[in-house]
Structure formats: structure tokens, C-alpha cells
Amino acid sequence: MDGIIPVVEKKDFLRWFLKEFTLKKRECSWLLNYLMSDDDLMENVHFVEEAERCPKALIMSTNDVHTVPFCFHKYQQVTMDAEKAFHDIRMNPEEAIYIQLHFSGAKHNPNYIAVLEDNPYVPENEDLIAKQKKLAEAFLERSVQSFEEKELLRRIDEALDARDKETFLTLSQQLQHLRQHSD
């Protein structure tokens, strides 16, 4: 599910898909055929999951699933009008187009999986990222505390060497306070 998918593979997949499935909106077939007619456009086509998170996305469904027939996302704008999507693609051929197809068995279909790419706009695993962030924060907190403790111990040693009882007592209290609040 990553790497660059050759245009030939994308076109072969779309030919197979259009032969095997009927899209809920016939304009979607026209749109996919239009994309296949231009290799430069196909270079910018990426099949992904969670396409709605992408800056420019086409989401299409076949008759055998219970999802929205067609949706075009462009930044925060959403439309169900395939003609608007066609016009946008024609006017902005250099922009990446992320396509998500809803059809029966999509998640296990080897033809679809072969052209499916990682969605760069979706964190790999949001839960994992949150856990890693917490671990990093805890590590940073322990590191700062360890540094502060070592610095206090160094300054306590200096106070002892200088026979500075007042500074020694103040720093000892700070060290004790730091250790109590670290548990």
C-alpha cells in the first residue's frame, strides 16, 4: 500500500473496475473514463482510503453498497455534482486527485489493493501517535527533573565545600521538594 503506482496499472484497474461494477451515477463512469484518457492526469490520480481528508477527492460508490453515490471534496467544499468535479479536474490538471471507491468486497479485493496507496493526509495510527506523544512528554519530564536534581546536588556540594550552611539548607529543601513531587 505504498510506493508509486504506474499509470498502466491504474488504467488497467479502472478498466477492470468499470467492466465489473456499475456505479450509482453514470457521470462517475464518464469521469473515470476521462481520467483514463490522459496519462498526465492519471499520474496525479491516487487511490486511497479516507479520501475526504485529502485536499481534492472523488468518492464514488457502486450499486451494490449503501453509501453516497458520489462526492467531490475540494478543501472544505463538498458537492455531489459530478459536472463540477469534471470542470475542476479539467481546469486544474496539475493537482493531485485522491479517489476512494466504495464497492462490495473493496477491502479484500486484490485488484483494488494493488493500486491502493497510503493516504498522506491520514496519520498512520492516531492512537499510536497519541501514545508516542505521551511517552515523549514523560521522557522529557523525567530528563528535565534528572537534570534539575543533578544541578541541585552539584550546587549542594559547592555549598558544603564553601561551608555555606544557609545555601546548603535552602538547596537541600529544594532537592527534597523536587524528589517529593516526582513520585
Swiss-Prot record:
NCBIfam families named in the record: PRK03636.1 (NF002965)
Source organism of the structure: Halalkalibacterium halodurans (strain ATCC BAA-125 / DSM 18197 / FERM 7344 / JCM 9153 / C-125) (Bacillus halodurans)
Q: Which residues form a coiled coil?
A: none
- Read off the Gene3D superfamilies from this record: Uncharacterised family UPF0302, N-terminal domain, Virus Scaffolding Protein, Chain A
Which Pfam families does the record cross-reference, listed alphabetically? IDEAL (PF08858), UPF0302 (PF08864)
What does the sequence similarity comment in the record state about its family?
Answer: Belongs to the UPF0302 family.
Q: Which HAMAP family match?
A: UPF0302
- The protein, known as: UPF0302 protein BH1670
